[in-house]
């Protein structure tokens, strides 16, 4: 990869992108959700384990199941979002290793007896993939509102029952209303956050 992205792209992904809490009344096309996955899935993970799992909440019935499980302060903005994505991590990601890592013979069987390692790997790599998911959404012209304020155990029971998936983040998706933004908070500068050794 030899070409840096232009300033417009960097602005859309990073410097001008915001976490949105208010949403314009504009639908998100279903095919855009498929595009989002097809883009985000290419981000790197350890051993290509790819533990991220997503439930896109769009319909009224699914919304009615999710909204009571959100923290009170997150319910109204979640109800207003065109799409709500529940981002989970599959602790049993090893079941897909023959497909994801065909070069690693026996990986599924080795991980089967290592639940603690699978838990740790799913946490780290699921979080990585959640970041890729947000950047992919921004790249496709969507705004994001990621949140941690929800009853994770209840969401697991409601949306991931019978699986080893554990909820990490609920992320509202759509076209944000800039009127709902507060002034942008600062970030740490290079000298505070980094060192060159």
Curated annotation (Swiss-Prot):
The EC number(s) this enzyme carries: 1.-.-.-
GO molecular function: oxidoreductase activity
Keywords recorded for this protein, A-Z: Flavoprotein, FMN, NAD, NADP, Oxidoreductase
Protein's recorded name: Putative NADH dehydrogenase/NAD(P)H nitroreductase Lcho_1290
Species: Leptothrix cholodnii (strain ATCC 51168 / LMG 8142 / SP-6) (Leptothrix discophora (strain SP-6))
Pfam family, one: Nitroreductase
Required cofactor names: FMN
Broad enzyme group: oxidoreductase
Entry's family note: Belongs to the nitroreductase family. HadB/RutE subfamily.
Database matches in Gene3D superfamilies: NADH Oxidase
Keyword NAD attributed: yes
